[in-house]
Amino acid sequence: MSYELQRPGEEMPIEEQMARTSLFTRLEDLVAWSRKNSLWPFNFGLSCCYVEQVTALTPVFDQARFGAEVIRASPRQADLLVVSGTVFHKMAAPLLRLYEQMRAPRWVISMGACANSGGMYDVYSVVQGVDSFLPVDVYIPGCPPRPEAVLDALILLQQQVGAQRRPLGVTVGNAAGLGFEAPRRRDQRRDERMAQTLLDPPEKL
């Protein structure tokens, strides 16, 4: 970037002014860029993995560098849900309700072995993978994962969000508004996944 001095009152050609002060891009690229760089996580934790998630917010790891430091206390103000810890069957229905209260577009990170696959708790009361009832975008392995893994997952999610070209949901004239949600593979088995909120007998696990 080059700098040059300009005297007060000196006129600059309009083309040069526009080149210095204006940015030209497509609207969908601008929206994708802003979503990518301003993820708002929902303040939600279930177990020991949540401690590592909060550690990523400390100055040592500085999650603010990635634009995801604004932790929201309400799901209606968040667009990122990090499921960190053991998900019990009793917690599945409230967790799904919190996810449904988040505004679209929204994303889910499954953090830790327990959230990914039930971990070492292969018992009747633990959901064997949060992806059985939520659409997961990024998985973080580990028991518990290190804060660096949380930052890696954020970077990976930002790359996915930046590459998505979702409709903006604008209504023009008599046209119907376009939705935000991109089709997901797990929607084909949605009814089967929604049944996960009920306790299964131990012999089915």
Curated annotation (Swiss-Prot):
UniProt catalytic activity: a quinone + NADH + 5 H(+)(in) = a quinol + NAD(+) + 4 H(+)(out)
Keywords from the named record: 4Fe-4S, Cell inner membrane, Cell membrane, Iron, Iron-sulfur, Membrane, Metal-binding, NAD, Quinone, Translocase, Transport, Ubiquinone
Enzyme class: translocase
Keyword S-adenosyl-L-methionine among record annotations: no
Binding site for [4Fe-4S] cluster: C48, C49, C114, C143
Compartments where located: Cell inner membrane
Main location: membrane
GO molecular function, one term: iron ion binding
UniProt region (Disordered), positions on chain: 184-205
Gene3D superfamilies named in the record: 3.40.50.12280
HAMAP family xref list: NDH1_NuoB
Family of this protein: Belongs to the complex I 20 kDa subunit family.
Protein name per Swiss-Prot or TrEMBL: NADH-quinone oxidoreductase subunit B 1
